[in-house]
Every structure is written in C-alpha cells, then in structure tokens.
Amino acid sequence: MQKSTPPEDLSRLTLLGREAKPSRKLETFPNRHPDRDYIVTMETAEFTCVCPMTGQPDFADLHISYIPDASILESKSLKLYLWSYRNEGIFHEHVTNVILEDVVAALSPRWCKVTANFGVRGGISITVEAEYKKPGWSKP
C-alpha cells in the first residue's frame, strides 16, 4: 500500500492551496480504503447564518460525520461552503438538512449525520440532527 497521497488525488482539487471566497462547491478526493467502514468527523465551532425573520446572527457548533464510500470530503472546500452561509437568512432546521443534502450529493457516502448545536436564543438552545443512510447499506 502506498503511504503518501498520490498526485492524481490532488488533480481535482481547485480550492486547496489557493486564496478563495465563500463557495457552495464541495470538493472530494478518492477514498483509498473503500473496503473498510470508518468514520470521518469534521467539526467547527464557527458556523454562522442569520435568522430569516430578524436578521440576527445565529451561531452553531457543527459536526459532520460520515462513512465514506468512494470519496472523501476536502476540508478547505467545506470551510468555504460553510462560510457561504454567513449572511444567509435560513432557519436552523432547514440549514442543517440542506448541508446534509449537499454533503450526500458530493460524496455519496454509506452513512452521514449532520448535527448543529445552535447557541441560546430567547433562553432556548436548539440542536438539529439530520441523518442519511445509503439504501441497502446497514451499519456493521
């Protein structure tokens, strides 16, 4: 087994190593261990969007976990993707599900879960969990 990342894995990446702006484009690279079920978790404590009613900022700890199939999510593209929501007026429940849908569309993972823990607003915190399981796949 090759121990370093082969150059062909880098050929599809257009954002990594370059100055960039917010983007809704999620990039991937090949999973070199498709025969194994393993969990990848990406987390940020800096996710922001805005309330569509008040325009006030909403802050969340965001966790994206998935079991890859053929592809792995490239982290800079995820950072720029999440940044694109900074000024987006969108409800917590909706944005969590949209992020799940976009990650699933980019990766076609075996399993994926997005958890968003939003900060307290009006004395109430909101946690949204959205989950996807590839048809026919069952967790071992």
Curated annotation (Swiss-Prot):
Localization of this protein: Cytoplasm
Enzyme Commission number(s) of this protein: 1.7.1.13
GO BP: any one term: tRNA modification
InterPro entries: GTP-CH-I_C/QueF, NADPH_dep_7-cyano-7-deazaG_red, QueF, QueF_type1
Known catalytic reactions: 7-aminomethyl-7-carbaguanine + 2 NADP(+) = 7-cyano-7-deazaguanine + 2 NADPH + 3 H(+)
Reported function: Catalyzes the NADPH-dependent reduction of 7-cyano-7-deazaguanine (preQ0) to 7-aminomethyl-7-deazaguanine (preQ1).
Protein name: NADPH-dependent 7-cyano-7-deazaguanine reductase
